[in-house]
Amino acid sequence: MARVCQVTGKAPMSGNNVSHANNKTKRRFLPNLQNRRFWVESENRWVRLRVSNAGLRLIDKNGIDSVLADLRARGEA
């Protein structure tokens, strides 16, 4: 399973660890993903999503029905 948020599309980025001596080594910045179940009242069922913390905040703000409608319009759910 890819480390990608199903709501926002956030994915890992690459960058550098930088030491005090300014030596740089490559690293990955991973999104803060959580596996969550959401109760969808209109469908009377649970929906599992792998979402980032930003995705959770979007769901809190807009509602799960709105977010699911956007996902289905994109063909992802």
Curated annotation (Swiss-Prot):
InterPro entries per UniProt: Ribosomal_bL28, Ribosomal_bL28/bL31-like_sf, Ribosomal_bL28_bact-type, Ribosomal_bL28_sf
Plastid listed as a keyword: no
Organism per entry: Burkholderia multivorans (strain ATCC 17616 / 249)
Region described as Disordered: 1-25
Keywords recorded for this protein, A-Z: Ribonucleoprotein, Ribosomal protein
HAMAP family: Ribosomal_bL28 (MF_00373)
Assigned GO CC terms: cytosolic large ribosomal subunit
Name of the featured protein: Large ribosomal subunit protein bL28
GO term, biological process aspect, one: translation
Cystines in this chain: none
Sequence similarity: Belongs to the bacterial ribosomal protein bL28 family.
PANTHER family listed in its UniProt record: 39S RIBOSOMAL PROTEIN L28, MITOCHONDRIAL, LARGE RIBOSOMAL SUBUNIT PROTEIN BL28M
Signal peptide bounds: none
Entry's Gene Ontology molecular function annotations: structural constituent of ribosome
